[in-house]
Amino acid sequence: MGLFIKKPFAALQAEANESGNKTLKRVLGPWSLIALGVGVIIGAGLFSITGTVAAGYTGPAITLSFAIAAIGCCFAGLCYAEFASMIPVAGSAYTYSYATMGELIAWIIGWDLVLEYTVAATTVSISWSRYLVVFLEGVGINIPHALAAYPWDGGIVNIPAALIVVLMSIFLIRGTEGSSIFNGFIVFLKVAVILIFVVLGWKYINAENYVPYIPANTGTLGEFGFSGVLRGAAIVFFAFLGFDAVSTAAQETKNPKRDMPVGILGSLLICTILYMVFAYVMTGVAHYSDFAGQQGIAPVAVAIDHMGHADATGVIHPDYPWLNRAIVLAILFGYCSVIMVTLLGQSRVFLSMSRDGLLPPFFSKIHEKYRTPAHSNLLFMVIVGGLAAFVPARVAGEMTSIGTLFAFTLVCAAVLIVRKSMPDVHRAFKTPFVPTVPILGILTCLCMMLFLPADTWIRLVLWMLIGLDVYACYGVKHSKLEHNVKRRKGLTILNMTGIALSVLSVITGLWHQQTVGWEEDKTLLAISFVFAFTHCAFYMVRIWKQTSEKKK
């Protein structure tokens, strides 16, 4: 089978049933998994993106946009739920791909997941730092800008962002059970703040603010009208990302075959309801046009300012001015759970790849006392902490989206494959309406990826090239499925993939430069060309050596 060898289902089942001091401790139940999902899905995006999208694209129909986005996300969620009940091991999409598409594809998706979780944790850590600065300024404490911003933003190092990564990593190293309890508390807190906003704001809803529910299109595609609702759905779609991290905790779940689908789909359902109700109240207490030009949590602040009574001059005096500070506090705590769950996800993917021999065994060692992959946790504490301290948030944020959507696409495709290749394997949960649901999931994710900026595609391609280098130099030789094979089949495909990615890096580089203008910053274009030429040479030399060895 060579590089497309598939991990036997029996081996996956044996891995799922492992027990003892050298395995992950099973402590999570269905509610813990739902809390993990809700914890990583709900971030500050709910408070900032809702008003912005309503003001620019949808009007009060933002609730429809959330519903459409949830349906699109549910396609991938249903596919994840089937695999999580069928193959309940750590590794998420990496493990599912290994069982259905083979080792090379599994490596690509595993490397992509590492990117997804790394940049997600980085992005949220940077945002956490910003909200901390705002919160402390409100109580008279000022952190010097140089110590709370990256170099490209006039600072030196973002210390708060790095510190929160270190703190959450220590939580994870000391045990999943304690981390789960902490996460549960945080989820309760931020859901409580959302519900308080909804309950307090309900009596201030003005029905006239919902008329028209879908404002007339301005004449530009995507600005109000039904096209605006669809554009809004594409934007708020990213507010649902993160539920896939639940599947990485399969080997720490007491009854994964039963509870994993509950955790994945339950968290999606709860978040959808919260998002829609929150958006309904927010656009009801204030007219959607009032949110225009607002950034951060300012749109919510506008709604809170309308939750009051007007005096004789018509000026509204808010009844709950403290709610703004409560929301900032909820965001700070809520971000902690997002960071923790993404750090958990990436360490579990690394653990699975290491156990399969594709990465050094150092990363699959389990801490004897805490029964957690401490080495992987420490590695990502250093990497994510460093990135959070020095990297711009926009770059990391867009990389999160494309990495997640790529993983969703392959998992949906894997369901189509596994239904044909493993029809008799027991599934505690089955994706309904196959092949319709997986196909719709693939199309939805690909459409979302196409709307992302060209520079995001460049970074994805460059990351994939680096990953292919690691696999070619280490993984191919140390894979446990074919560790005794001296010359593995499929090396030509591997080398051609490297050349194809090199060409793609040039294409995306030129695409980006054309988008921003040929006179603008050409740094990314230069990097893509350097990567392309060096990797083309590297993989062509590998092909030449392979051909020479065959002739001997």
Predicted regions span which residues?
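Membrane-interface "cap" regions at the ends of multi-pass membrane proteins
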Residues: M1-I49, A55-P60, A67, C74-L78, ...
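Extracellular loop-to-transmembrane helix junctions
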Residues: L3, K25, S48-W152, I270, ...
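Membrane-helix boundary/coupling elements in multi-pass transport proteins
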Residues: F47, D112-R130, I235, F240, ...
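Membrane-interface loop-to-helix entry segments
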Residues: S129, I156-A207, I264-L268, T400-L410, ...
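C-terminal membrane-solvent junction of multi-pass transporters and transport-like membrane proteins
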Residues: D153-I156, F363-T372, F408-R459, I466-S502
